[in-house]
Amino acid sequence: MSEPEEQQPDIHTTAGKLADLRRRIEEATHAGSARAVEKQHAKGKLTARERIDLLLDEGSFVELDEFARHRSTNFGLDANRPYGDGVVTGYGTVDGRPVAVFSQDFTVFGGALGEVYGQKIVKVMDFALKTGCPVIGINDSGGARIQEGVASLGAYGEIFRRNTLASGVIPQISLVVGPCAGGAVYSPAITDFTVMVDQTSHMFITGPDVIKTVTGEDVGFEELGGARTHNATSGVAHHMAGDEKDAIEYVKQLLSYLPSNNLSDPPAFPEEADLTVTDEDRELDTIVPDSANQPYDMHAVIEHVLDDGEFFETQALYAPNIVTGYGRVEGRPVGIVANQPMQFAGCLDITASEKAARFVRTCDAFNIPVITFVDVPGFLPGVDQEHDGIIRRGAKLIFAYAEATVPLITVITRKAFGGAYDVMGSKHLGADLNLAWPTAQIAVMGAQGAVNILHRRTIAESGDPDEARARLMQEYEDTLLNPYVAAERGYVDAVIMPSDTRRHIVRGLRQLRTKRESLPPKKHGNIPL
């Protein structure tokens, strides 16, 4: 005996209309087939809705355009018109703060973007701009929906334009938790932060097969565009997560340091600091080694200054010779930029300059004070550096500091040589408060290089060149390799005990809360891109 057919609701009655709505909601919620969901889970990936549930506060998600469907009839697409069209969009809260979100659904058309799909993303981005809340894009897509032709490409262009208009107005965060290929990669590239998952995320303009055909190069997905590649080599991403839950947790923590928009202050948990110097503070008095050639870990300095020693690092695997990230001082977010003597002696190179410049501009856009720790012997020498554009690309860091109007505090811990001294948040670029430790060496260059240039003939003509060089180097060090020449000219505002660093930063930030500074009227600057 066959099962009776499910009775369809009578949509001419109120009860029937309500039942019909429930049926449609059920269809929209389960737009992907059970088999597609199973395959997604088998890869260790979550579904679009599961990701939203993890990201947002429980019960806060409000979906938009749940019943949107594509209108294409090409190649039999009209036979398959799932609700939602392969992307879930809406708004909700993270830790009680409003955010907008879109989550691409790989279980529907492989997450491929079509016209209506793109319109949904554009609509939620416009909504975020209107309401002044961050937008988080969860990317897991096979790329453009080929069957819809140029309509798909047009949708990408509309998204890129919204990314650009929203830049510096609302925080934009991209979670790449699957493939993101072709033109689709440019949306995350424009956003403020990109988070990828190890062994799961892949981003590239052209895939391995096309590269093999065109250039003959053999490369796998992971090597070409995996999370490690984009975190350590290209600098496209800001964090490599172990799994999707880790990635989402990183985004939630990141949001806690960012304001909702450019007209808001970052979230603060005001707490008056105890300015008494502690034994922990005194550890900084011995952190810089006696030998100028011996490294130390700048992370230790950073953690001594921040509340509870908590430092939230960004781009930790990329350009490790410079450290960037967020922390709090008296419960208020600050951005940190610091040379890292443990890597390339803290030299600035192309990647470090661009990493720091982007970070400073992000902080400036979103009203986050920047604290800079300086220990830099100069720019990294090398033919490759010069040929790859260190002049133009290093200038980006100058531009970033010089146009920043947020509070800027700089602490010189040891070396500050040559042009790199100027570049690293110097008084000359507009820093508000410049401090130096007694161990600071602020000069055109180090003793050996200077003596070899200034006293080449004297050394050559002396009976004992080694003794003469050592004596002249000592004279140079005593005369110029200190913070006091700069202090005499007001280039540093104070020479302080290292153990007093947090106290000075706390007081400085208190005073700078009312800082008022504006740039000359202009359409925009012409940063040396």
What is the predicted function of each stretch?
Residues 1-529:
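Ligand-binding clefts of soluble mixed alpha/beta catalytic domains
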